Swiss-Prot record:
Pfam families assigned: Ribosomal_L9_C (PF03948), Ribosomal_L9_N (PF01281)
The protein's role, per its UniProt record: Binds to the 23S rRNA.
UniProt key word Cell inner membrane: no
One of the GO biological process terms: translation
Organism: Francisella tularensis subsp. holarctica (strain LVS)
Annotated GO MF terms: rRNA binding; structural constituent of ribosome
Database matches in PANTHER family: 50S RIBOSOMAL PROTEIN L9 (PTHR21368)
Protein name: Large ribosomal subunit protein bL9
Gene: rplI
Length: 151
């Protein structure tokens, strides 16, 4: 199925590209989430008329994402968690806790789907480097300091 992309989609294309995708991917993800429209002759003509407006909106979203990334990057965010002897946590610190800590301590809204933990959940006290994927091609490297909670 051919679709016209209305915004940049990772590993697929950029705004205005006409790409071939599997019908299920188009029907269940791209079209319902407003990332693409089916590539009919009428849609191609309508898209050409709206292209400048869509590019301006895409640029505004990108600039907003860069501003959020600049506000949160290169900072240390502290999370208090219950820990036993030897610095081992009772439980773990996952993406939800990291997203909440970054949102609360920076004042910027971060969704848990944006947090990348390549080594999995945190299970000990210490400082860890993580990535927040703010937008397509916009990542912010942050440090999370997990400390023992006061009893």
């Amino acid at each position: 199925m051919q679709v016209i992309l209305k915004e940049k989609v990772e590993n697929l294309g950029v705004l205005g590209d006409i790409v071939n995708v599997k019908p299920g991917y188009a029907r269940n993800f791209l079209i319902p989430f407003g990332k693409a429209v089916q590539a009919t002759q009428a849609n191609i003509k309508a898209f050409e008329a709206q292209k400048a407006e869509l590019e301006k909106a895409e640029k505004a979203r990108f600039e907003a994402a860069v501003a959020v990334a600049d506000a949160i990057k290169d900072k240390v965010y502290t999370i208090a968690a219950q820990a036993g002897e030897g610095g081992k946590l009772f439980g773990s610190v996952g993406i939800a806790e990291v997203a909440e800590a970054v949102s609360n301590q920076s004042g910027k809204k971060i969704e848990k789907s944006q947090v990348r933990m390549p080594e999995g959940v945190i299970r000990s006290i210490g400082e860890f480097e993580l990535t927040v994927h703010v937008y397509t091609d916009v990542d912010a490297d942050i440090k999370v300091n997990v400390v023992a909670a006061e009893a």
